[in-house]
């Protein structure tokens, strides 16, 4: 079975020449010539490069190519060089010569395969690549032949995007011409000035409100919201930070008058307390009455003076013991004199006067000699009474 190969050669050396495909079968020259007449294609006589390429290809492929599908080889002169692109892998079987002889055995392939070769050449070498041309210019025939619909869509999108970018750049340049560079800084400065002005106004308003509030407080009294004007009953003032209670009721005195009157009340109470203590201490020594009247007066003072007695309990006990001692002395004087009341009064008066003049030792000797005193009080109570008498004597005459 013969194997046919499809070669397509495109030579653009001259403008009058067009693409002409060529088909060459692999094998002898007769089969190649027969296949050439079968497809009715002719090779230009003035194209030396095409004939040389065909002869080189025919001499370069001394083997058969087997594949399950048709193979397409595109030979393009895009970067001023010929490149061979194979779309699918090829399976080949080499024919090995027997003993280096010129004759070779021909093997029949299982399936007919074709190989297509396309050769294109630029008119001018210095012509730029069609993809690098200006997108604003209209597309040429070569661009249309090379580009697929997808490539045309991509190119159109790129062109539109570039036009939009150029338009925005032009608008930005125009705006920059209308507005100088320092416009932004001037706007920021104006904004800061507005903020500072607002802050100053707020502070002034707050200060005015606070001042009005303080004036209202000072005029109507401290935090007086009822509208009632108070007047001090002592100094007749209406402005005070605090109102105090006075003789005319609560909040009838100003702060200064209330403090002054409170101090005066405390001083009067202290003076009264001191005078009461002094009267209690001096009253038993004011008068010396006869014996019976004196005892009655002392009892009355002791009973009525307990309210004003602020002395410690030891002093009160000493006074009671002293009263009992005087009673015992009177009883002794009655037993010794026993004659008349006159002698009794004289002895009592003499004993009271002598008690003030006697020393402590004489008083103890006198008490020890009295039998009535020893009968009434035991020894320890007697010693306690003597000590209390000594203490009271020192307090009165000290």
Swiss-Prot record:
Residues 20-51, 122-144, 289-353 are annotated as: Disordered. One of its GO terms (cellular component) is nucleus. SMART domains: ZnF_GATA. PROSITE patterns: GATA_ZN_FINGER_1 (PS00344), GATA_ZN_FINGER_2 (PS50114). InterPro entries: GATA_ZnFinger_Domain (IPR052138), Znf_GATA (IPR000679), Znf_NHR/GATA (IPR013088). One of its GO terms (molecular function) is DNA-binding transcription factor activity. The keyword Nucleus applies. Expressed predominantly in leaves, and barely in stems, flowers and siliques. Residues 32-42, 291-302 have a biased composition (Basic residues). One of its GO terms (biological process) is regulation of gene expression. It comes from the Eukaryota. A zinc finger (GATA-type) spans 226-280. A motif (Nuclear localization signal) lies at residues 109-116. Residues 343-353 have a biased composition (Low complexity). Disruption phenotype: Pale green leaves and reduced chlorophyll levels associated with altered regulation of sugar-sensing genes (e.g. HXK1, HXK2, STP13 and PLT6). Reduced chloroplast size. Faster seed germination. Early flowering. Increased leaves size. Reduced gibberellic acid (GA) levels due to increased GA turnover and associated with reduced expression of GA-anabolizing enzymes (e.g. GA3OX1) but increased expression of GA-catabolizing enzymes (e.g. GA2OX2). Small seeds with deformed seed coats. The double mutant gnc cga1, lacking both GATA22 and GATA21, exhibits reduced sensitivity to cytokinin (e.g. PANTHER family: GATA TRANSCRIPTION FACTOR 21, GATA TRANSCRIPTION FACTOR 22-RELATED. Transcriptional regulator that specifically binds 5'-GATA-3' or 5'-GAT-3' motifs within gene promoters. Involved in the modulation of chloroplast development, growth and division in a cytokinin-dependent manner. Repressor of the gibberellic acid (GA) signaling pathway that represses flowering and modulates greening, in a SOC1-dependent manner. Prevents the accumulation of SOC1 during flowering. Promotes chlorophyll biosynthesis throughout the plant, by regulating chlorophyll biosynthetic genes (e.g. HEMA1 and GUN4) and chloroplast localized glutamate synthase (e.g. GLU1). Interacts with SNL1. Forms heterodimers with GATA18. This is GATA transcription factor 21. It comes from Arabidopsis thaliana (Mouse-ear cress). The gene is GATA21.
């Amino acid at each position: 079975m013969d194997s046919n190969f499809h070669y397509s050669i495109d030579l653009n050396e001259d403008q009058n020449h067009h693409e002409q495909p060529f088909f060459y079968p692999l094998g002898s020259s007769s089969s190649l010539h027969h296949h050439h007449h079968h497809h009715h294609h002719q090779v230009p006589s003035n194209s030396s490069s095409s004939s040389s390429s065909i002869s080189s290809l025919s001499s370069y492929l001394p083997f058969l190519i087997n594949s399950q599908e048709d193979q397409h080889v595109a030979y393009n002169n895009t970067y001023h060089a010929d490149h061979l692109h194979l779309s699918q892998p090829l399976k080949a079987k080499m024919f090995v010569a027997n003993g280096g002889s010129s004759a070779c055995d021909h093997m029949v392939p299982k399936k007919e395969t074709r190989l297509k070769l396309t050769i294109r050449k630029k008119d001018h070498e210095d012509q730029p690549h069609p993809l690098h041309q200006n997108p604003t210019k209209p597309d040429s025939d070569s661009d249309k032949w090379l580009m697929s619909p997808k490539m045309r869509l991509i190119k159109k999108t790129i062109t539109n995007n570039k036009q939009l970018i150029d338009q925005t750049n032009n608008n930005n340049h125009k705006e920059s011409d209308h507005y100088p560079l320092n416009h932004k800084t001037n706007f920021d400065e104006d904004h800061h000035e507005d903020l500072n002005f607002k802050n100053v106004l707020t502070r002034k308003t707050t200060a005015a409100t606070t001042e009005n509030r303080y004036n209202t407080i000072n005029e109507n009294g401290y935090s007086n919201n009822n509208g009632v004007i108070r007047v001090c009953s002592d100094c007749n003032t209406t402005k005070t930070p605090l109102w105090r209670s006075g003789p005319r009721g609560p909040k009838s005195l100003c702060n200064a008058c209330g403090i002054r009157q409170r101090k005066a009340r405390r001083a009067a109470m202290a003076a009264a307390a001191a005078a009461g203590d002094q009267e209690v201490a001096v009253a038993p020594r004011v008068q010396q009455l006869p014996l019976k009247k004196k005892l009655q007066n002392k009892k009355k003072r002791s009973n009525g003076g307990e309210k004003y007695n602020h002395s410690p309990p030891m002093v009160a006990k000493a006074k009671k013991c002293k009263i009992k001692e005087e009673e015992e002395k009177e009883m002794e004087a009655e037993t010794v004199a026993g004659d008349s009341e006159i002698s009794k009064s004289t002895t009592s008066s003499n004993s009271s006067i002598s008690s003030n003049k006697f020393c402590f030792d004489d008083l103890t000797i006198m008490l020890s000699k009295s039998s009535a005193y020893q009968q009434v009080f035991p020894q320890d109570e007697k010693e306690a009474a003597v000590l209390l008498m000594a203490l009271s004597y020192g307090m009165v005459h000290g």
